[in-house]
Amino acid sequence: MKFCHIAPVPHLDLVKKQSTHLTLAHIAAEDNEYCAFYQEQAKRPQTINIMDNSGFEMYKAGMPNFPPEELIGLAKKVKADYIVIPDYPNMPSIVGIDDARRYAPAFKEEGFGTFFVPQSVKGDLEDLILSFAFAASNPLIDYIGISILAVPHAYNCEKGNNLQRFLSRWKFMNEIKARGLLQLAKDNGKLIHFLGMVDGPNEIALMQEFGIDTWDSSAAIWAGFNGVEFDNSPTGLFDGKYEKHVDFQAKIEDNTLVQLAKHNMDYINELVRGINEV
């Protein structure tokens, strides 16, 4: 497994040695320094860049998704290899499926791989599974993203119960494995990515049997910048997810906090070591 730590723009040096990156469309649209950094990263051999559509950030801010046509231009600015197709939290699966059928060919025509995020309305687990099944079997899709929002939504536990939220993606992966859909995805050459992190880094340990290829999160760096250290509790974060939204322009002058962020990154890097290595 490859892990994509995400850093605020003034601290991109923290992630410069990664071989896999997840970039964010809403930052690429506004920050030339950000784009220039990832243009340089693309020159490194065997570096992979997934450009997210910033759907999580736009949803939390109550803003609409980027138009797919604009995503192509932004992906070129950061030299991305894959584009996350627009996804729609708390919407029926067919909305995202229709967009995938419409826009995946255009993304491929421009030379990008395609990344699909299954979604459903809150409480509709079967529709979320249907959405995954579409991606697992459709040749238009290269990558499948397991969302930090979609899965807790499907189990009605996105807010108010950290334990249920922490376990929700583990439960979902077991469900699709039992139905043969995870194997179907692997048989069809799909890559599996985990988007974000919920209530502690030890979620990684729960997922080690599922053949996850890549995972991203800003949790290690952002928690560290705010004085929160990953710990030896069962989840790795005794009080659960640090809920304050990431400020991607934050400049941290206190070196103690920067070192704490590095400690948290090392905690995750040690967890992923040896998982699904090829």
Where are the regions that the model predicts?
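Non-catalytic, usually N-terminal nucleic-acid engagement modules in DNA/RNA processing proteins
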Residues: 1-110, 276-277
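Alpha/beta catalytic cores of nucleotide-metabolism and tRNA/nucleoside-modifying enzymes
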Residues: 1-10, 69-72, 176-192, 200-278
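Glycine-enriched alpha-helix->loop->beta-strand junction motifs that scaffold or abut catalytic
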Residues: 18-23, 46, 79-80, 110, ...
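Conserved residues at the C-terminal ends of beta-strands
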Residues: 25-26, 86, 147-149, 218
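Terminal peptide-recognition signature
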Residues: 52, 116, 207
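Residue-level preference for long, well-ordered alpha-helices that form the structural scaffold
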Residues: 64-67, 92-99, 162-169, 174, ...
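Alpha-helical scaffolding segments of alpha/beta enzyme cores, especially the outer helices
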Residues: 70-73, 98, 102-106, 130-134, ...
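Glycine/Thr-rich beta-alpha phosphate-binding loop at enzyme active sites
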Residues: 113-195, 199-203, 219-243
